[in-house]
Amino acid sequence: MNKKIIWGILGIVVIMIALVSMNVLQENAKEAKEKKEREARYVQAAAEFYYNIELMGFVATFVLPQYSEAWSKAIDDRRDFNVAIHAKRKSLNSMVAQSSVIYSDMEGQLKTMSEAVKENPNKYKELYDEYKKMYGTITSLKEQTESPSGTLVTFNQNANMLLQEYKKYKGNIDVAVSQDIKNEVEKIKEKNKK
């Protein structure tokens, strides 16, 4: 009788250990899957932000010189430069409006990157810091593309300074960005070519 009770208790203990072990394994697998999904989301956000940096840089380098040229030409022709700038702004409106949409997306991508830094600072901290600097520069460039301000001279000085900052931060980002993010950027570029 005692042997039956001992074997019964051992059987129950073995079953309980097996159930607990299975539960722990399932939790570990679930946690690993969630971590992998978060990592994929972080890489995607970093890649999209990088791609959007390039788009915003293109818009700024395309739009700002056109404002300057229209402004300068209006002054040379003794016309109201406000009218000339407004007309140029109107002709570039769809591009400038699209840059506002891109800029809004970048805010969310930067927020996702801040989550990535909290979870994996060794991988994302340097890139996130450079992204924040770039975001500040892009904010100023966006403001100038939406509403050029100052005199022609100060506008040109400001635009040139901002474009130089953009190039500097872009170079820093190119060094800091990891290969998996670069690969994802290439996928985004291919997808957007279609």
Where does each model-flagged region fall?
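Positively charged n-region of N-terminal signal peptides that target proteins for export
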Residues: 1-4
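C-terminal amphipathic alpha-helix
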Residues: 38-93, 130-194
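Ser/Thr/Pro/Gly-rich low-complexity linker/stalk segments immediately outside membranes or between
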Residues: 25-44
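Structural signature of transmembrane alpha-helix termini at the membrane-water interface
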Residues: 19-26, 142, 149
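Mature extracytoplasmic domains of secretory-pathway proteins
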Residues: 96-137
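Short, flexible coil/linker elements and helix-boundary hinge sites characteristic
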Residues: 23, 100, 118-120, 170, ...
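Hydrophobic membrane-insertion alpha-helices, especially the h-region
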Residues: 9-21
